Regions:
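A glycine- and Lys/Arg-enriched "phosphate-lid" helix/loop adjacent to the NTP-binding pocket
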Residues: 85-133
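NTP-dependent small-molecule kinase module
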Residues: 133-177
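N-terminal regions of ATP-driven nucleic-acid and macromolecular assemblies
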Residues: 12, 23-28, 121, 128-132, ...
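Substrate-engagement module of ASCE P-loop NTPases
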Residues: 51-63, 120, 124-131, 135
């Protein structure tokens, strides 16, 4: 979306999710740091959700499989899916609940991907932590599967188990085997 929409039209779209607040109107400068971070994220997610919903609706219409992932895929997106569909929707959120572990993961990511500098994330760590805390609370309220991503192998196993259980439950409900 960033390549299609000029920064002058939607400046919050051209920021990272954890600092989209910097593009919010000036009257929000007086909000607390944590509220600004969350408000900026939600403004940005509102914009991204338009495209995500279009992709989702097209996949439903064309009956194709779709994996939609990212920090902007909020629990509310599920409400945009008609109940008159055969779609199997599995919502999962990953979280790292240990601050030191998340910092280590940022450092490791920067070693494996030259374009993802750890310092950028570490400098904004408090905002990232606040945002993750808020997203995990939203997920808990929406009764989504929350998978702790402290260990890659364990997280992958839990994701696969969650998918498998959801497929099994769907098949039992629809009488398929």
């Amino acid at each position: 979306m960033r390549t299609m929409v000029a920064v002058q039209l939607m400046p919050e779209l051209h920021e990272s999710s954890f600092n989209a607040w910097k593009a919010l109107p000036k009257h929000q400068e007086h909000a607390s740091g944590s509220k600004r971070v969350i408000d900026g994220y939600h403004r940005q997610a509102d914009l991204v959700e338009v495209a995500a919903e279009a992709v989702l609706q097209r996949a439903l219409r064309e009956n194709v499989s779709l994996l939609l992932e990212g920090v902007h895929v909020r629990p509310s997106l599920i409400n945009k899916i008609s109940h008159n569909t055969n779609a199997i929707v599995i919502q999962i959120i990953l979280g790292v609940t240990n601050k030191k572990q998340l910092q280590r993961q940022f450092q490791g990511r920067s070693k494996s991907s030259q374009n993802r500098r750890a310092d950028r994330y570490l400098e904004s760590f408090d905002a990232i932590w606040e945002l993750q805390t808020s997203l995990l609370a939203e997920a808990k309220t929406a009764n989504l599967s929350i998978i702790i991503n402290d260990n890659l192998i364990d997280a992958l196993a839990m994701i696969m188990r969650s998918i498998s259980n959801s497929l099994r439950d769907h098949n039992l409900k629809t009488g398929q085997s």
